[in-house]
């Protein structure tokens, strides 16, 4: 079996996920995992599928031939797990340019690796402006200092509320 990781982006439309999944199934593929979202009128997806070796070329061609979609495909890279522990985080505060870069830099400096990140702007109740919210997961070593990560994230500004959960 070949394991493939792909990104898919294009104008959102009804039936798009069904079309993708039908294409995978038609080539005897197994949809293993995915993350999908609608952003600014576009469908954006990241997915991992397995298919028989003899079907992989035809599957790739079929996916790349889908209407109005840009598909980028890579073979799965298997690596040893160097960071066996995951920590979930949430950061909420005033939005500003560069906040995602600051957040990701603080996580790296503290010794973590961002594995998942979802960010959004939300209306702040009674404030009349938007607030930034990020949630995600960080892979860390077994002996990782959780308090050090909280300190690094809180140092980004007094307006940020930070929470971690194992």
Regions flagged by a language model, labelled:
Residues 1-166:
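A conserved regulatory-domain signal marking ACT and ACT-like small-molecule sensing domains
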